[in-house]
């Protein structure tokens, strides 16, 4: 049986992504999880920014459809909601999430439970 990889390197952004989400957790738990994560001998994992999560989507399909799909080369495909590290500026008890079932970007309380998929590499903030 072929074993699934633990990471995936994005050829577009050169960021390395955690392949499997460990499940749902609060934003605070997600930060702790990322700080303790070690995959493939690397321990510099972090929660992605909202812009980094957005790089997984093919926004060009937005004109053909109501909701963009994940880019074709992204190997993990799901319709779950993921935490970003980006705090909502107007209400710091909230952070941005990306809902991949509709490519929605929304802010929710950091005490809510959403999935996390860690990333490593040069941070995209603009």
Per-region residue spans from a language model:
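Short, structured beta-strand segments at or near domain termini in extracellular proteins/domains
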Residues: 81, 107-126
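A ubiquitous, low-specificity "background" feature that marks scattered single residues
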Residues: 16, 58-60, 107
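An exposed tryptophan-centered "aromatic clamp" motif
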Residues: 31-44, 50-99
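Extracellular adhesion/carbohydrate-recognition regions
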Residues: 1-45, 115-119
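Short solvent-exposed loop/turn micro-motifs enriched in small/polar/acidic residues
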Residues: 1-2, 75-76, 110-111
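Short, P/G- and charge-enriched loop/turn segments at secondary-structure junctions
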Residues: 102-106
């Amino acid at each position: 049986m072929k074993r699934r990889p633990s990471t995936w390197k994005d050829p577009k952004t050169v960021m390395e992504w955690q392949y499997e989400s460990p499940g749902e957790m609060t934003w605070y738990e997600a930060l702790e999880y990322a700080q303790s994560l070690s995959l493939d001998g690397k321990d510099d994992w972090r929660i992605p920014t909202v812009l980094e999560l957005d790089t997984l989507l093919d926004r060009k399909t937005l004109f053909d459809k109501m909701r963009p799909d994940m880019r074709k080369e992204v190997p993990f495909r799901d319709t779950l909601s993921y935490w970003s590290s980006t705090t909502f500026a107007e209400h710091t008890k909230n952070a941005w999430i990306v809902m991949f079932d509709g490519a929605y970007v929304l802010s929710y309380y950091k005490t809510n439970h959403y999935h996390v998929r860690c990333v490593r590499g040069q941070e995209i903030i603009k």
